[in-house]
Amino acid sequence: MSALEKSMHLGRLPSRPPLPGSGGSQSGAKMRMGPGRKRDFTPVPWSQYFESMEDVEVENETGKDTFRVYKSGSEGPVLLLLHGGGHSALSWAVFTAAIISRVQCRIVALDLRSHGETKVKNSEDLSAETMAKDVGNVVEAMYGDLPPPVMLIGHSMGGAIAVHTAAANLVPSLLGLCMIDVVEGTAMDALNSMQNFLRGRPKTFKSLENAIEWSVKSGQIRNLESARVSMVGQVKQCEGITSPESSKSIVEGIIEEEEEDEEGSESVNKRKKEDDMETKKDHPYTWRIELAKTEKYWDGWFRGLSNLFLSCPIPKLLLLAGVDRLDKDLTIGQMQGKFQMQVLPQCGHAVHEDAPDKVAEAVATFLIRHRFAEPIGGFQCVFPGC
């Protein structure tokens, strides 16, 4: 493993592996928790951060797709927010509250296909081209032929899709572009170990609280406030799924049924039904999307991304969790002044969740600097040195 890949993994992957059974068990409840200290892992509704929610219908060749968006603000440019792989529009919740208080703008946070509450006919097609078209179609469905000024802001996979959307000119009123912690070089290096990372995650959780607790204690999201609203969009409640214990009981019951005579089979069937009922009471939660199955699209998201980003003829902003993430093309581009860059240290990969206020300040400063938006609430720009 190269030094570059090692340094990338330290910020991008969880800082330590989850404790055995932490996804849904109470084994990790005392981990590094002082006596009497207790944190609240209960989920928080989207309505505490966004003003409204809308399901946008889009017509295409396969029929009608429905894309979930969360909105805030009524004036100024539209900040169209695209989440990372496996996340949802709710990952932008805390950032939304922060940016709305700094500049006059409108927020549209979109659940990309196969993520969150978006429903599409062909949920297996996660190619960069298809998702970029989705973004353009949603803008057209919401605003018609005369869309307001739009700035695309994307994190990780969403950052790649934002660049593909901009490069294909699918949003005619696009005025700016922002990528958050996604760089072609480090992203391509990370793909080799991504399956191992995904296999290391818990497959199910006993409750939303357990999912939120795992996300924070594993380091996936370092900001508890964001995790309490964001994880709701990452997991779903399963109907009819069986836990390992219940599965074992059912299998043992089937074996026993084969060995029993007709008189005993009735009692075995009764036990099996009781096991099934007990399982349904648990209703474990699992991930909304199986990211491991999307592997064939990963290369298409990130290959050639740096040059594609540099080629977009609009003001550009790159926010990174560490300067070590820069690849050769972006390093040269940054030295030539082709985009604005800001490093936000002490963050994990989910920069906008870990440090929503800092990201909001960077985006607000970018908007004001280019005269795309007006400051509100006495917000003062602090221009970065890099």
UniProtKB/Swiss-Prot annotation:
Demethylates proteins that have been reversibly carboxymethylated. Demethylates PPP2CB (in vitro) and PPP2CA. Binding to PPP2CA displaces the manganese ion and inactivates the enzyme. Its EC number is 3.1.1.89. This is Protein phosphatase methylesterase 1. The modification Phosphoserine is found at residue 15. Pfam families: Abhydrolase_6 (PF12697). It comes from the Eukaryota. It comes from Rattus norvegicus (Rat). Keywords: Hydrolase, Methylation, Phosphoprotein, Serine esterase. It catalyses: [phosphatase 2A protein]-C-terminal L-leucine methyl ester + H2O = [phosphatase 2A protein]-C-terminal L-leucine + methanol + H(+). Gene3D superfamilies: alpha/beta hydrolase. SUPFAM superfamilies: alpha/beta-Hydrolases (SSF53474). GO terms for molecular function: lncRNA binding; protein C-terminal methylesterase activity; protein kinase binding; protein phosphatase 2A binding; protein phosphatase binding; protein phosphatase inhibitor activity; protein phosphatase regulator activity. Phosphorylated by SIK1 following increases in intracellular sodium, leading to dissociation from the protein phosphatase 2A (PP2A) complex and subsequent dephosphorylation of sodium/potassium-transporting ATPase ATP1A1. Belongs to the AB hydrolase superfamily. Residues 1-38, 255-280 are annotated as: Disordered. It is an enzyme of class 3 (hydrolase). Binds PPP2CA and PPP2CB. GO terms for biological process: regulation of sodium ion transport. The modification Asymmetric dimethylarginine is found at residue 16. InterPro entries: AB_hydrolase_1 (IPR000073), AB_hydrolase_fold (IPR029058), PPase_methylesterase_euk (IPR016812). Residues 255-265 have a biased composition (Acidic residues). The modification Omega-N-methylarginine is found at residue 16. The active site is at residues 156, 349.
